Design a protein with these regions (language model features):
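Conserved N-terminal diphosphate/IPP-binding helix and adjacent helical/loop segment
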Residues: 35
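Short Pro-Cys-Gly-centered "Cys-loop" motif that presents a nucleophilic cysteine in a tight turn
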Residues: 1-25, 29-30, 38-234
Length: 234
């Protein structure tokens, strides 16, 4: 129901204000949602508990029911902002198109698309201007370039570059955060335990410890640290 989406956005507004979140993109689907969140205070898990908990309470009260709305814990990834911010912004607003619910992001009201391309005042927690400024400092040109960028990416998948189920970034980014795991009590511990893995071996180590080429390929890929392209080029 549209009222339910409005309730979610109202709760999100309160959470962003309380936890100092910045939202770069969002899309509310019928049974899940996507948020691209920047957390200057490393408080993702606290904010997510508040967001899901308060929203669930409000929806259950409205519909006179009890229980959970979402199955399992949320999934989160640590993103290299320089490399993947725009890619994720595009991916998120295209969700309804990929799901074949609409033909264009402009037909789905419950994402940040309309704030990006329209003359609608954005909520204070939505980083509309900062995203548009990456395309042009002229707003009209920025909107045009942003729109073209989004529509050019309907068939593009970014998830082949996901490492360890947690990191979306290049090798340098992954190595940086892996090497700081013990110090990142505020960052990596924000992620569900099942998403955290011990650092993978090098491709050469997998090769040396495996009895066959196929086994080395399987173990390397299963580690989540390497894409098939990485393995093929080794």
């Amino acid at each position: 129901e549209e009222d339910d989406f409005e309730i979610f956005l109202s709760v999100l507004n309160d959470v962003c204000k309380q936890y100092n979140w910045v939202i770069h993109a969002y899309c509310l689907m019928t049974n899940h949602y996507h948020l691209l969140i920047e957390t200057p205070d490393a408080n993702l898990s606290k904010g997510m508990r508040q967001l899901n908990g308060v929203f669930t309470q409000k929806i259950n009260k409205k519909h006179h029911r009890v229980g959970h709305l979402f199955q399992g814990r949320y999934k989160s990834i640590l993103v290299d902002k320089d490399a993947y911010l725009l890619e994720l912004c595009r991916y998120i607003v295209l969700n309804p198109v990929r799901a074949k619910m609409v033909d264009s992001p402009s037909q789905w009201f419950w994402s940040n698309w309309h704030y990006m391309v329209g003359n609608i005042t954005s909520p204070p927690w939505l980083a509309t201007d900062s995203i548009l400024s990456l395309f042009s400092h002229n707003r009209k040109d920025a909107i045009k370039e942003y729109s073209e960028f989004v529509f050019s990416g309907e068939g593009i998948s970014i998830w082949e570059n996901l490492r360890h189920q947690v990191f979306l970034g290049n090798d340098e980014f992954v190595e940086k955060y892996q090497s700081l795991q013990d110090e990142l009590n505020g960052d990596l511990k924000e992620f569900p335990l099942k998403q955290r893995r011990k650092p993978a071996l090098t491709l050469l180590q997998y090769q040396q410890q495996s009895s066959s080429r196929d086994e080395a390929i399987f173990l390397s890929y299963q580690s989540g640290a390497y894409t098939l392209k990485d393995i093929g080029e080794h």
